[in-house]
Amino acid sequence: MKKEVCSVAFLKAVFAEFLATLIFVFFGLGSALKWPSALPTILQIALAFGLAIGTLAQALGPVSGGHINPAITLALLVGNQISLLRAFFYVAAQLVGAIAGAGILYGVAPLNARGNLAVNALNNNTTQGQAMVVELILTFQLALCIFASTDSRRTSPVGSPALSIGLSVTLGHLVGIYFTGCSMNPARSFGPAVVMNRFSPAHWVFWVGPIVGAVLAAILYFYLLFPNSLSLSERVAIIKGTYEPDEDWEEQREERKKTMELTTR
């Protein structure tokens, strides 16, 4: 565990999660600013969030895995894909990055366009229970897309994971904005809420819904649909950060990284 934390690759990965979440929040929230001359459309916001996540997954995915979302990180922990310590540092970096991204946007946005900085809120008389279920479903489909499109065990061509994930985020926003402003990402909701000091009684929805949805997707994918053939000791080693995969696994992982491009050969 200590060896993992002290490695340069680990530090780079944590920084990549911080930077990616900062950029994601800046562009995503920026697309939702209410300019007096032109109010944002649902399609505009959905495309901005989707393009941002696709771009960042393409650019920084090979460094950290491109989680950019505490719900996805926790789901991968439950799915036995990352260590507990890595999950902790990733989530911390994502939350700090989200605050930084929202803070920068707050600083550069004119007062008449800033509004509430796109803080997530319940819309159209949606109840907290309804909102939680919506966020759960939206994040469930996103997590399934991420797990399937980045699974190193798949031998058939899967196209571009970055493009697939970006489209999944766009899809979620096209539906979710009407209910909750669409979170699917606790960091996306937490950042502007901190900067604006605006935590509504329903803020928990944007944590519980996405996390439960992503964790359910991890259980379904990694334990029921496509379970790993790992022993109990190997699973414990992964959680502790002491697991050392064999050379064949590493070769498959490197080959998988080559598919993180916008076109396939």
Curated annotation (Swiss-Prot):
Glycosylation sites: N124, N125
Main location: membrane
Transmembrane segments: 13-33, 40-60, 88-108, 127-147, 159-179, 204-224
Consequence the record notes for mutating N123Y: In PPKB; changed water channel activity; the channel is either leaky and/or more sensitive to hypotonicity; associated with increased TRPV4 basal activity
Consequence when changing N123D: In PPKB; no effect on localization to plasma membrane
Catalytic activity: H2O(in) = H2O(out)
Positions of short motif NPA 2: 185-187
Effect of I45S: In PPKB; no effect on localization to plasma membrane
Membrane topology: Multi-pass membrane protein
Cytoplasmic side: 1-12, 61-65, 75-87, 148-158, 225-265
Subcellular location: Apical cell membrane; Cell membrane; Cytoplasmic vesicle membrane
Signal sequence, start to end: none
Keywords from the named record: Cell membrane, Cytoplasmic vesicle, Disease variant, Glycoprotein, Membrane, Palmoplantar keratoderma, Repeat, Transmembrane, Transmembrane helix, Transport
UniProt-listed CDD domains: MIP (cd00333)
GO terms, biological process: camera-type eye morphogenesis; carbon dioxide transport; cellular hypotonic response; odontogenesis; pancreatic juice secretion; protein homotetramerization; saliva secretion; water transport
Placement of sequence motif NPA 1: 69-71
Tissues of expression: Detected in skin eccrine sweat glands, at the apical cell membrane and at intercellular canaliculi (at protein level).
Extracellular side, ranges: 34-39, 109-126, 180, 192-203
One GO molecular-function entry: identical protein binding
Domain remark from Swiss-Prot or TrEMBL: Aquaporins contain two tandem repeats each containing three membrane-spanning domains and a pore-forming loop with the signature motif Asn-Pro-Ala (NPA).
Family stated for the protein in its record: Belongs to the MIP/aquaporin (TC 1.A.8) family.
Subunit structure, interactors included: Homotetramer; each monomer provides an independent water pore. Interacts with TRPV4; the interaction is probably indirect and regulates TRPV4 activation by hypotonicity.
Illness the protein is tied to: Keratoderma, palmoplantar, Bothnian type: A dermatological disorder characterized by diffuse non-epidermolytic hyperkeratosis of the skin of palms and soles. PPKB is frequently complicated by fungal infections.
Its biological purpose: Aquaporins form homotetrameric transmembrane channels, with each monomer independently mediating water transport across the plasma membrane along its osmotic gradient. Plays an important role in fluid secretion in salivary glands. Required for TRPV4 activation by hypotonicity. Together with TRPV4, controls regulatory volume decrease in salivary epithelial cells. Seems to play a redundant role in water transport in the eye, lung and in sweat glands.
This protein's name: Aquaporin-5
Organism: Homo sapiens (Human)
